[in-house]
Amino acid sequence: LGAGDDTFVWDPGDGSDVVEGQAGLDTMDFNGANVAENIDISANGGRAVLFRDIAAITMDLNDVETIRFDALGGADTVRVRDLSGTDVTTVRIDLAALGGGGDGASDTIVLDATGGDDVVQVVTDGASIRVLGLAAEVVI
């Protein structure tokens, strides 16, 4: 990506990628599929990694500040690990099905704390739940 605020979009059928965000506030928008997916977001040194079990997709991210996962249906499990040391400040998880409604499937979100002493706050903000106090804010 170039300098400035950029958005990189991943859709089912795309392969694994390395994303270099560079300057500005950059976002990776990762679109899921209407199947049960396992998504794992973690740190690898100063880089962030998003792994999707369906098709063994790995997104290797540097200088990306926001990761947005749109589930689009299915009984999904999303795990956000300690993102300390990465540039990620916000992880947004949208569990709505295609078209914006619910799909009746049970989703699971697991958030890992950092290696230090954490004071975690869970607050509602309209229709969203915000988790504050971890390495990155998580908005569900």
List each language-model region with its residue ranges.
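Acidic, glycine-rich low-complexity segments
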Residues: 1-140
